[in-house]
A protein has these predicted regions:
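Flexible "cap/lid" subdomain of the alpha/beta-hydrolase fold that forms the substrate-access gate
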Residues: 2-21, 28-30, 40, 68, ...
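Active-site beta-strand termini and strand-to-loop segments that position acidic
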Residues: 25-26, 34-35
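Short, flexible helix/strand-to-coil boundary loops that buttress conserved ligand/catalytic motifs
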Residues: 36, 55-58, 79, 150
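Short beta-strand element of the alpha/beta-hydrolase
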Residues: 39-45
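Serine-hydrolase catalytic-loop signature spanning alpha/beta hydrolases and amidase-signature enzymes
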Residues: 48-56, 67
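Recognition helices and adjacent regulatory flanks at domain boundaries
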Residues: 53, 72-75
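A short, Lys/Arg-enriched amphipathic alpha-helix followed by its capping loop at the start of a domain
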Residues: 56-65, 105
Length: 269
């Protein structure tokens, strides 16, 4: 790893065999864990997780790829840059630029990327904004942000409460999450389809700790505010211009989750 990278001092609960680094990208620092050899593969997590969501998958992928598991800005051990009234520092466009810079510091100018949930949105924005950097892309449990808002109904609101709740003006969402971080994590991990026992105590504790950090709470809410405004506008602008992802793309979703029916509806248009 280049000497310019500043190694992070962390107590890991998983991925102990992966090298840890805190990479300066200009606007913030991005925490990564890296291992393996072969073509580079960037893995991006969702809410309310961190890079630890890949703890069971990344070691297997590292037998074939150079795997980089990153924390999005505002999440995990990455930096929490100050936001602005338009939430631009937490738009997926800014998060995608972080990943381009971080991978460049790791000397990867072109790479594959896979993202789940919020990370999937960063992944497809990365492929749209930086097509020469992305070799191929996989998105897991994701509809484009503009499409999700267009289709939003009562079922969506009840199943994906963070979308509208966390996008409310500060400080209400931050205060609500700060009051019951354990309940938020348990609902997210247990209520969104995870079988019992998948998340060990260390991983759960790491996720809860993030929601006890006021700066991270605000950053996460800013990311949702950006999704409801800037991210949606960026998607709509791309659609209006006919701008598309040009590299190979794999979209996967759970057959038993609500996204399944929405994908079927999209296919039927």
């Amino acid at each position: 790893m280049p000497a310019a990278l500043r190694c992070a001092s962390v107590t890991a609960v998983a991925l102990d065999d992966f090298e840890a680094a805190l990479i300066p990208t200009g606007e913030t620092d991005i925490f990564v864990r890296r291992a393996g050899s072969g073509p580079p593969l960037l893995l991006l997590h969702g809410f309310p997780q961190t890079h630890l969501m890949w703890r069971d998958v990344a070691p297997r992928l590292a037998s074939r790829y150079t795997v980089v598991c990153a924390d999005l800005r505002g999440y995990g051990q990455s930096g929490c840059p100050a936001s602005t009234p338009d939430h631009a520092p937490y738009a997926k466009r800014a998060m995608a630029a972080d990943m381009v810079a971080a991978m460049a510091r790791l000397r990867f100018d072109r790479f594959a990327v896979a993202g789940h949930d919020r990370g999937g949105r960063v992944a497809y924005r990365l492929a749209l904004d930086h097509p020469r950097r992305v070799d191929r892309i996989a998105v897991l449990d994701v509809l484009p942000t503009a499409e999700a808002w267009t289709r939003a109904d009562a079922r969506f609101a009840l199943a994906f409460w963070p979308w509208a709740l966390l996008a409310q003006p500060a400080p209400l969402p931050e205060r609500l999450l700060a009051a019951v971080p354990d309940a938020v994590i348990d609902d997210a991990l247990g209520g969104w389809g995870s079988p019992a026992g998948v998340f060990n105590d260390g991983v759960r504790a790491a996720y809860v700790a993030a929601l006890r950090d006021p700066d991270r709470l605000h950053a996460i809410c800013e990311e949702y505010r950006a999704a409801a405004t800037l991210d949606r506008a960026h998607d709509e602008a791309d659609q209006a211009r006919g701008r598309r992802i040009t590299c190979p793309l794999l979209a996967l979703w759970s057959a038993q989750g609500p996204l399944g029916t929405w994908y079927e509806a999209a296919d039927g248009r």
